[in-house]
Structure formats: structure tokens, C-alpha cells
């Protein structure tokens, strides 16, 4: 991988990580619940946005390879978080919050797939 591509990914990652911390913190401070809604919200928002970015890339709305890498691998890669989702799911089970754990897992997995598809199809409808 070329250095300039890695730099673009790093810039996107910097932006995505800051946006993730801010968004998750904002949601967690507003919503007090056993389910970690901060992580859920960044995963759902990130899946929607990634679907939109991939749609824009596929249909020619985003052509610059550095912008592609910055937005997808960098920004959305840092904004969303599978590892935190996994650890939070583990602790919900560990604390015997089985309904919350299963709800959290289903909301993440199914919600993210639906929103990624919706983002892609929305951009497809605009750019196709």
C-alpha cells in the first residue's frame, strides 16, 4: 500500500475516532439503559453512511481513490466498532442480562445490515 493511501486512511481514522467518541458519549449521557446505546448508535449510523459511501463509489459519485480510502476504511472503520460490540455483548451475558444481550446483538446485526442496504439503495436511486 502506498504511503499517501495510508495517510488518507489515517486522516479518515482520526476523524472517525473523534466522531465515534463524541457520538457514543452523547448518546450514553442521554440514554441510561442496560443496553449500550452509544455503541449501537455509532454502528447503525456508520453502517448507513458506509452503504451510502459504497453506493457513491460504485455509481461514480466518489472517484478519487484517496477520498474512497479515507471515507470507507479510515473514517467508517474508526467510527464503527465490532470489538466494543463484542465485549459489551459478552458483559451483558456475564451479568445475566440475557434479554438485553440478545436484543443488543439482534439490533446491531440486523439493524446494521438493513441500514447499510438502505444507504446503498438510497444513493443508487439518486446516482444510477
Curated annotation (Swiss-Prot):
A Pfam family: CRCB
Keywords on record: Cell inner membrane, Cell membrane, Ion channel, Ion transport, Membrane, Metal-binding, Sodium, Transmembrane, Transmembrane helix, Transport
KW Ribonucleoprotein (keyword) present: no
GO cellular component: plasma membrane
Modulation of this protein's activity: Na(+) is not transported, but it plays an essential structural role and its presence is essential for fluoride channel function.
Organism domain of life: Bacteria
GO biological process, any: cellular detoxification of fluoride
Residues that span the membrane, as ranges: 7-27, 37-57, 73-93, 96-116
Binding sites annotated in the UniProt record for Na(+): 77, 80
Subcellular location: Cell inner membrane
UniProt key word Membrane: yes
PANTHER family in the cross-refs: FLUORIDE EXPORT PROTEIN 1-RELATED (PTHR28259:SF1)
Role: Fluoride-specific ion channel. Important for reducing fluoride concentration in the cell, thus reducing its toxicity.
Stated family: Belongs to the fluoride channel Fluc/FEX (TC 1.A.43) family.
Name the record gives this protein: Fluoride-specific ion channel FluC
Native organism: Nautilia profundicola (strain ATCC BAA-1463 / DSM 18972 / AmH)
Amino acid at each position: 500500500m502506498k504511503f499517501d493511501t495510508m495517510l488518507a486512511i489515517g486522516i479518515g481514522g482520526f476523524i472517525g475516532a473523534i466522531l465515534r467518541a463524541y457520538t457514543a458519549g452523547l448518546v450514553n449521557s442521554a440514554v441510561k439503559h442496560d443496553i449500550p446505546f452509544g455503541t449501537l448508535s455509532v454502528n447503525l449510523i456508520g453502517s448507513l453512511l458506509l452503504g451510502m459511501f459504497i453506493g457513491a463509489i460504485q455509481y461514480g459519485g466518489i472517484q478519487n481513490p484517496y477520498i474512497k480510502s479515507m471515507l470507507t476504511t479510515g473514517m467508517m472503520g474508526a467510527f464503527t466498532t465490532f470489538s466494543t460490540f463484542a465485549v459489551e455483548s459478552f458483559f451483558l451475558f456475564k451479568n445475566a442480562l440475557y434479554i438485553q444481550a440478545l436484543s443488543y446483538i439482534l439490533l446491531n446485526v440486523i439493524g446494521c445490515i438493513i441500514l447499510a442496504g438502505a444507504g446503498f439503495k438510497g444513493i443508487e436511486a439518486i446516482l444510477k
